[in-house]
Amino acid sequence: DKNTKYAIRDRAILEVMYASGLRITELRLLKISNLIFDYDIIRIIGKGNKERIVPIGKTAQIWVEKYRKESRIYLVKKSKENDDILFLNSSGSALSRNAIWEMTKKYASLAGINSNVYPHIFRHSFATHLLEGGADLRAVQEMLGHADISTTQIYTHVNRDYLKEVHKSYHPRA
């Protein structure tokens, strides 16, 4: 059922992962106080305790608000100390990395995707789709929180493959 408190939470998680490119630890420790939806951004504390601001799209915002209003209110009642953590498990605690992995695999399987799907694939898709859409590599580096641009350049190989395919398909002497 797509309307259970867990299904709504899980959809919100999947939307946030794809919309923002967060690392799994950043996602599981995301705080409500760091959601700045009036400006379409979220504040992230990333690796090395570095802060960054990441834009977040309306679809993800809608699902997060739905989760907060329809699901989280029940989960937070069981919380002992995590009242600011956004995504909670059935005990009211922050989700574990493993729980997010299992949830990702579950929905991939339900969607008929049998290849190896894991949370980082959403971060990879986020970066790849931005670059394929023409985003500046430096801007993508900032959004991902990479200290070194060479780490971000890993995502450009897909873009190169795409460019080769376009060239092969459309250039008369390819």
Regions picked out by a protein language model, each given a short descriptive name:
Residues 1-174:
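Conserved catalytic core of the tyrosine transesterase superfamily
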